[in-house]
């Protein structure tokens, strides 16, 4: 038999497919080989060709999946980071190893270049590392964790069990996340469900039975379903805690701990937050495995385009100062805004069209991307201040929106949307409320209440002067806030300019402090006083805000001791009350002298008491009186105080001379430390061990001490220096300010140690009365009649009274109502025997049979529309009369139907509006068809 001709196509063993795999990869070394002549190879009988089976007999399927995923990622990547090659500058999503379908979805959504948080987090997440990301809402953090999730999950799994879990603090944020997942998941068959409070539990039972891939939920409802359905979470590979600081603030810590206990240890956990409270750091240490902290350096620095102005005011002038800044400095217009006028001008037909209305709102948002000179955000201390300022500014005629932590979610969304679309120009918020809001680029930021930490100041003013645009921040500083201002000045490392000490002031590089013009400020203060006298509601709101401020000041962080000492000198100086350099052109020399005179009168303190004045004038009746005992006691106290002042002054002079002599003797020994520690405040001894550990991690104290010791070798140093250079470690660093490190640590270089990285990034915001227990007595008791004793009233408020709380699997207390038996009743009603276990094959069409939405949110549901004749009432039943009346009413309704339309239905007679509308539709059809009328 003649031999068979060789096949023109090469076999799998002779054809190299690497060229086809990497044909678009410019960095691949593989090249397409030319076809070679086929050689005849004699067959080897009884040869076992299963080499892979013998070599990899012990390997698992997970290793194969990891190998395939790695190869596919390298094939998708346009430019690999190989030796001698670097990724292109400004590389987009193509350089991250994403598949083609996901890249198309990203381009369809309008993402061309990744945001900074996306550029930093996505490569780390793709390497299966746990990540703690600090980013505000609006920075693209939602896509930063959704894109890697879709890339990792790829397609729907036929094995039962969810693989992705996203926990959000509110229903609105969960809906927003679901929308992003749906848009980026186009082209895949991934199923996603939304589990939030307020929806039907039975429908959510059907959703979970439909084997979703991604679960987007709030912690309370997801824990309820977990306990009720006895869910097995061992299949989850990807967990995201979105707005984690908000989750802890709303009291979801117990729910998160219980959920975290049921997750597998092999999961990948991501945690995104706007700030990093201490409680969140502890949670991350316990729930994440060697996490990586991702924090943008740009969010920890003040923009160089930001100009700052600090105004010294008195407590009674704060409202007037705020109005003066809005009216005279920002030139804020009063009355309705242009956006609100445009909405009023629209006809009723346009307002009824939802699609057109939504398009107009989106167009308004896009127009708001470039800041106007009137968009302003005002930061207040508590929610009571927010309510008070909102009412006061509304009374002044401004268009205002307000947001605080405990505000209803729907109202919060409406208020923020009004500000974004330009319906209002001013947004009054608290630090807690503004932390995660997607606020557009602003032109002005006003600190009505000065922040207690430099971090919070940076967090506030970081919303303006973005993308190369100019911005202003105005801060009202009282005498009690001066220490915090000096702490901020030390942290920023800028020059402090009081009043008109310098003719040339750079508001972007200096901390310029001064007062507002007295004439304009007095007018606004008089207007505020008149409003408070006329409006009882605003007066009551001010009283409540004053009480809330007292509680806020009790919990506020204390300023440094050195700044408190300097603040006394700064506040008592004449330049503290001088006119701010911002108003230098407006005030003439005569006005400046007038301001100085008013400042002297305002700061006048009498040297004599009323008793001394009366005695000098001859008593109350104008005649000389005998020496009074009160007057004698006052004189004795005054003489004692004057003697103490003299002693203190002499002691200070003696100490100064002693220090001068010591500096001359040991000048060489302390010359090195003196220059380095010139700006170190005195409260450095209060630094904790963690702060010292962070500081000393990049500083070699032994070398520094040995260097100072070598420079100070003399005969007199052994009696002066007490430290042993071999063992002594100084508590102050020689090259950096520890106060700056404590205030805000900008990470640089390696970030391998999460604990040390989070110490500098931790920031706790003061509550704005939104937190439970703020301003309330800690122990509220009530009398328990049954047990004859006092018990805590907190049990009645959080549901822990009696047996309403049970311990979950992790030991945390959860509500006992989570296990109510509704899932068993639902299974019985749906005639479901047993749902598939995790890892088993899913049942096709199970979700549709159970009445779910097929694994998606917002699916169509069956509705009963058929009408049947009512059954006749049974005389033997107890509700015979009731059923008889129902049957008669149903027969009357059926008898009233004429021609299929009820008596209450729409009339078929056309009115003038119907005829006019029909003519318009007919004319539109004629124009659309573009056909001439038929000739008769």
Swiss-Prot record:
Boundaries of every Helicase C-terminal domain copy: 360-511
Catalysed reactions, semicolon-separated: ATP + H2O = ADP + phosphate + H(+)
InterPro entries: DBP10_C (IPR012541), DDX54/DBP10_DEAD-box_helicase (IPR033517), DEAD/DEAH_box_helicase_dom (IPR011545), DEAD_box_RNA_helicase (IPR050079), Helicase_ATP-bd (IPR014001), Helicase_C-like (IPR001650), P-loop_NTPase (IPR027417), RNA-helicase_DEAD-box_CS (IPR000629)
UniProt cross-references to PROSITE patterns, sorted A to Z: DEAD_ATP_HELICASE, HELICASE_ATP_BIND_1, HELICASE_CTER, Q_MOTIF
Biased composition (Basic residues): 917-936
Motif (Q motif): 91-119
Stretch list, region Disordered: 1-48, 337-363, 642-684, 701-721, 843-936
Biased composition (Low complexity): 701-717, 896-906
Keyword entries, A-Z: ATP-binding, Helicase, Hydrolase, Nucleotide-binding, Nucleus, Ribosome biogenesis, RNA-binding, rRNA processing
Annotated EC: 3.6.4.13
GO molecular function: ATP binding; ATP hydrolysis activity; RNA binding; RNA helicase activity
Domain Helicase ATP-binding: 122-294
Biased composition (Basic and acidic residues): 341-352, 867-895, 907-916
UniProt subcellular location: Nucleus, Nucleolus
Acidic residues compositional bias, start-end: 663-675
Pfam families: DBP10CT, DEAD, Helicase_C
Motif DEAD box, residue range(s) on this chain: 242-245
Positions of ATP binding: 135-142
Source organism superkingdom: Eukaryota
BP term (GO), one: rRNA processing
Chief location: nucleus
Example of a GO cellular component annotation carried by this entry: nucleolus
Comment text on domains: The Q motif is unique to and characteristic of the DEAD box family of RNA helicases and controls ATP binding and hydrolysis.
Family listed: Belongs to the DEAD box helicase family. DDX54/DBP10 subfamily.
Name of this chain's protein: ATP-dependent RNA helicase dbp10
Native organism: Emericella nidulans (strain FGSC A4 / ATCC 38163 / CBS 112.46 / NRRL 194 / M139) (Aspergillus nidulans)
